Amino acid sequence: MPRLSTFSIAAFDPDDGAWGVAVASKFPAVGAVVPWAKSGAGAVATQAMGNTSFGARGLEMMAAGRSAQETLDALLADDVGREHRQVGAVDAAGQAATFTGKECLAWAGGRTGEHFAIQGNILTGPEVVDAMAQAFRLDSGDLADRLMAALLAGDRAGGDRRGRQSAALFVVKPQAGYGGFNDIWLDYRVDDDPDPVPRLVELLAIHRLYFGKSPADDQIPIAGEVATQLQRIMASLGYYGGPVSGAYDETTRSALTAFIGNENFEDRTDFAAGQIDRPVFDYLLRKFGG
């Protein structure tokens, strides 16, 4: 069985009630193996010659009230391959634990801190996990931002000494899934790419673009130059056949409704009030020109 030469972070955000894992590896589709998380239970990262049963079993144990350390102790107690395993966990209370078996290939090791467990194997050196820990502590964003800051810091510090191939971000919090029907807030994977961590950063930005919402002071009126640029874009794409006047009239509104609908930004455009979220407008300009 190939080893998952990997660096990962499992973490908890008590303010948001979120648990998650970010991971990168010189191995394809690392997101299918390493990250596990369950709202109200915790998060697990299982790697090296990873025992994938540690994911579901570990979450079940922590959901039943075991701490992260108690969970790792129980998982490893009867595992004949324990010295080839590397695993980190953060429990329902945010307590963290990490384990690196003696047979994991160098450099291998981990760090724990308040609400996080970091671990890696076949790394360029301990500077990778140290950089990850510092980045997680210093970032002031939400859990997804902090996880990605840590992963990017580890990647920039050297990461997997064999190279780069895949990365993943998995985050859960209560009713954060699409439509509020489950707890999966973020589940993004870059399965085979020469530079997967920056690509994963881009995917998180895309998620925020489509599912975010701007504050009132970042919503701009569709009038004047904004309307003119949108009319030009829509005319070039065949949505709009009227004059490029800068007026938000009924013809423009009808065309914009169709255009924005096809681009999936209905929730970030107020057609009745004639307003659009600035990040969406900026994105449309970059994508289509103005």
Which residues fall in each region the model found?
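Basic/polar N-terminal segments that are highly enriched at the extreme N-terminus
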Residues: 1-2, 290
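N-terminal nucleophile
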Residues: 2-224
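Short acidic, glycine/serine/threonine-rich helix-capping segments at coil-helix boundaries
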Residues: 218-289
